[in-house]
């Protein structure tokens, strides 16, 4: 209860304070869609640095979830509305590889509770900011299907063909979600890709059974969406190096959200990544770093380092979702700082 009261107070306070004047705030709010589109034009640098961070809310679906998204968007001054995906496919008793054949294609109706959240947020903010719902990967839905405590890699290897059919059905299910969300106000999508890190699946199964259906999600999003972010997820399973990351360069997307550190001890060069992908990079900060655990001043110093080494057309954010307890006031301070960074630093 205290946390809820604190966040309510924080929303009220943050709505009346900030780095910019009220007039400037209104100008930014009315042009967030335009400012994101300007970043996509890599023929010229942009003085304004868009920024956004994400965290999961206590309320997952329904009116309270809509309100949580509204409060967070307003309080942090972020540049687009990212809608969390909080619906799970039913668990199926997968005891052997053959049981993957039980996985169906889920219809648009299955995703209706999630789409309702998108529709409400689009009604509220669609004219001022892009509405970008999260899209989980087919592999993530496969994990939901078997539930906790089961070895997905082992079950996939028992019957790769049946597993591949399940992944296909889950990818087609996600396509149904995408098309429904687009009809109800989504401008595009934040598409998560998983499985290509070389850890969660064997390279053979990834290449032969999963990759085309993982990529299919991005292809559908690209077909129907105005703007899309590809999130190359390494949650719990880091990629070996940057070259492994660049294997996703053929995925269609407007913007790329990237991991920062690799299992061989190396780190990502943001300018090189933007050049290799040929699209703006979104990220730069570690989700469990200073943005979660440091002070506002420490976080600003980290932003300095990121933006000094990033390409001119860049969107500041984290490499994945930040912890739910992350201070909203700190996120607001960092976002406001990024917005004006190139002007205040003459870069």
Predicted regions and their residues:
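Bacterial N-terminal signal peptides that target proteins for export
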Residues: 1-9
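Generic low-complexity segments that are intrinsically disordered, proline-rich and/or Lys/Arg-biased
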Residues: 4, 21, 26-27
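N-terminal capping/small domains of soluble enzymes
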Residues: 40, 44-103
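C-terminal segment of classical bacterial N-terminal signal peptides
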Residues: 14-22
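Active-site loop segments of alpha/beta catalytic cores
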Residues: 25-56, 79, 83, 106-347
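Terminal low-complexity, poorly structured segments
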Residues: 9-10, 228
